[in-house]
Design a protein with these regions (language model features):
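Acidic, low-complexity/disordered tracts enriched in E/D and polar residues
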Residues: 1-40
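Long, charge-rich, low-complexity alpha-helical segments
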Residues: 30-88
């Protein structure tokens, strides 16, 4: 998967927030904010192809968590990003 072109992570009033830049982005009814872990993952894979295992390995490297926990967390964030339409 890959972050869809035009979506960027910005700091909005101290919060890591996904914003759609440019024509053709979806109509947002709310801001999409990310916690520190999700923002770290976003920044790590921005402009790259990635999968759940890529995200899990990043979590393991950064936080030293076990593989099962990392895969569960990585799948949850990837599923959420797919659901809201910011990755494809």
């Amino acid at each position: 998967m890959r972050i869809i072109e035009g979506f960027r992570l910005r700091n909005v009033m101290g919060q890591a927030t996904i914003v759609g830049e440019g024509v053709g982005q979806i109509d947002f009814n709310k801001l999409i904010t990310l916690n520190d872990s999700a923002a770290y993952l976003w920044q790590s894979v921005e402009d790259k192809e990635f999968d759940v295992h890529t995200l899990a390995n990043l979590l393991i490297e950064k936080y030293g968590i076990d593989q099962d926990t990392a895969l569960t967390d990585a799948k949850a964030i990837a599923d959420k990003w797919i659901e809201i339409g910011v990755v494809g």
